[in-house]
């Protein structure tokens, strides 16, 4: 007896219908953009700065002009900024503390983070021909504010303004600004008259006043910790202006 072969199964109506396409799930990664730190970030967590001034004696001896160098430190004695003065060689010998200049502020890596420009202004307490004004740029080329002198016959006053001209602080000093056997403070107030800080020029003794004051000196500024870094930079610039105005001999 002949055996019948098994029937051949019919081909599927659609070729490869039994092959399923693999399901691939692609997770979309979320890119987190970290904001670039502000160029003045070193001031973000400080509430006081201590400044040491040193005259570059070699420049004076070799007739290269009178130029200062400043070292700005925190309360922990960490060096924050180094400031170099730039001016024409002759103005320091004739204009003294009123000389026009530029201050280049550099951080610990040597990067210039701020520049202070001070034009010449002939100023005196009794007959102010011109009032003092400095402009602050951070980064260099971008103005963040200015410090301007207000004429008063008794107590010196200065206003701190942002780049748009809005006043944010004003500084008021004592009637006598000579640092002799006492500390000299300029108090800092906001627009509501609330004290937010002060600058201080400390008395360091009679020997220092007689022999060392023209070469090296120390002063500082204190302010509220929660101020923005631009405002802290403006107060630092105001402190430097006060030193040139009253104590640069």
Model-identified regions with their sequence ranges:
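Low-complexity or membrane-interfacial segments used for flexible interactions
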Residues: 1-102, 106-114, 118-133, 139-143, ...
């Amino acid at each position: 007896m002949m055996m019948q072969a098994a029937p051949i199964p019919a081909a599927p109506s659609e070729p490869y219908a039994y092959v399923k396409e693999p399901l691939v799930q692609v997770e979309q990664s979320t890119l987190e953009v970290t904001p670039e730190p502000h160029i003045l970030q070193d001031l973000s967590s400080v509430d006081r700065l201590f400044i040491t001034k040193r005259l570059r004696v070699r420049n004076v001896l070799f007739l290269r002009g009178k130029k200062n160098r400043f070292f700005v430190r925190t309360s922990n004695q960490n060096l924050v900024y180094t400031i170099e003065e730039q001016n024409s060689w002759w103005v320091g010998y004739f204009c003294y503390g009123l000389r026009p200049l530029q201050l280049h502020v550099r951080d610990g890596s040597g990067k210039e983070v701020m520049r202070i420009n001070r034009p010449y202004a002939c100023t005196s307490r009794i007959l102010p021909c011109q009032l003092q004004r400095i402009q602050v740029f951070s980064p260099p080329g971008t103005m963040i504010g200015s410090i301007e002198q207000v004429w008063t016959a008794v107590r010196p006053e200065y206003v701190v303004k942002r780049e748009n001209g809005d006043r944010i602080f004003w500084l008021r000093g004592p009637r006598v600004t000579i640092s002799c056997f006492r500390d000299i403070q300029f108090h800092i107030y906001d627009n509501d008259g609330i004290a937010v800080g002060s600058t201080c020029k400390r008395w360091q003794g009679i020997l220092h006043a007689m022999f060392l004051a023209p070469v090296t000196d120390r002063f500082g500024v204190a302010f509220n910790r929660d101020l923005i870094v631009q405002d802290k930079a403006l107060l630092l610039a105001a402190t430097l202006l006060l030193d040139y105005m009253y104590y640069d001999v």
